[in-house]
Regions:
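Exposed extracellular interaction/assembly regions and N-terminal maturation sites
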Residues: 1-88, 119-136
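Extracellular beta-strand-rich solenoid/capping regions of secreted or surface-exposed proteins
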Residues: 49, 100-107
Length: 136
């Protein structure tokens, strides 16, 4: 069953292999990232003030290239727990408008986000290596 969003319903998959700015119509979509080619990718989230209740999941469909990072950016903080699946370590991200998958992150690395109208909350995040907060 499709999930409702502002002005309609959605629940589709969206492929991402280049810089992408998400729209309100992308609410509920699962983004499948393809960072298999060299070169960083930035996924920009919608403005928080117009996105209360907006949810998205971003998953690497293939392993990142050794020279590729996939960064998710917002106009405000992205907060919550992040788990490093390789070491089992977890970290609580308290501030910062960017989170992402590092060079050579493996397929299946994921982050699920929801907006409360003031910030983005991490509902679930796991990667085989530590997540990044900026492109390098």
């Amino acid at each position: 069953m499709a999930r409702p969003y502002i002005g309609g319903s959605n629940g589709a998959i969206k492929a991402v292999s280049a810089d992408t700015t998400l729209q309100l119509a992308d609410q509920g979509k699962t983004l499948i990232g393809d960072g298999s080619s060299a070169g960083n990718i930035t996924i920009t989230l919608p403005a928080t003030t117009s996105s209360k209740g907006y949810e998205t999941t971003i998953v690497l469909g293939v392993a990142n290239n050794a020279a590729t990072e996939v960064l998710i950016t917002s106009d405000t903080n992205i907060v919550g727990f992040i788990i490093d699946s390789d070491t089992g370590a977890s970290a609580y991200a308290t501030a910062g408008a960017s989170r992402g998958f590092a060079d050579a992150a493996k397929a299946g690395s994921k982050i699920k986000l929801v907006c409360d109208g003031a910030k983005w909350l991490i509902l679930d995040a796991a990667s085989d290596i530590a997540m990044v907060t900026a492109l390098t």
